[in-house]
Amino acid sequence: MAQFSESVDVPDMGRRQFMNLLTFGTVTGVALGALYPVVNYFIPPATGGAGGGTTAKDELGNDVSVSKFLESHNVGDRTLVQGLKGDPTYIVVESKEAITDYGINAVCTHLGCVVPWNAAENKFKCPCHGSQYDATGKVVRGPAPKSLALSHAKTENDKIVLTPWTETDFRTGEEPWWS
């Protein structure tokens, strides 16, 4: 009868197997690292707090004080602040004591240029391709296909708070395209 040995020799990992394992690990790590930004691109960014809104910021990133804002601006002035999602937003002075209850997003709906207010002509005029919007941001001349987006503007603790506009657009009577 043949006698079997109790200890079975298990061969050590050879150099070739080790190099294959090391190469596989390196390639997998690089591929996952390259794939991360691609996957991240398709995940939408988180929105702000639950209906809390965004405090308007000036050009230096400081909160806009309503009392100081009204002291330094005339009735009918439209002034840019940093609004929702960091977009430039016009705040309109309604009277010496109040701002309008809406802000006008300054990003042109044609190609995304910032649209300046032309006080002499009482309208917004895009410098890129000539689109024009009335005093409320409604498109009056193309090539821009849509009116400027709106946001709610309200005063809380002497600060301007902007919240998303989800109701019917008062300028067109239609559902807002931006929500």
From Swiss-Prot:
The answer to whether UniProt assigns keyword rRNA-binding to this entry is no
Q: What is the membrane topology here?
A: Single-pass membrane protein
Q: Which BP terms in the Gene Ontology apply to this protein? A: photosynthesis
Q: Which reaction does it catalyse?
A: 2 oxidized [plastocyanin] + a plastoquinol + 2 H(+)(in) = 2 reduced [plastocyanin] + a plastoquinone + 4 H(+)(out)
> Which Pfam families does the record cross-reference, listed alphabetically?
Rieske, TM_PetC
Cystine crosslinks: C113-C128
Quaternary structure note: The 4 large subunits of the cytochrome b6-f complex are cytochrome b6, subunit IV (17 kDa polypeptide, PetD), cytochrome f and the Rieske protein, while the 4 small subunits are PetG, PetL, PetM and PetN. The complex functions as a dimer.
Record's protein name: Cytochrome b6-f complex iron-sulfur subunit 1
What is the originating organism of this protein?
Answer: Trichormus variabilis (strain ATCC 29413 / PCC 7937) (Anabaena variabilis)
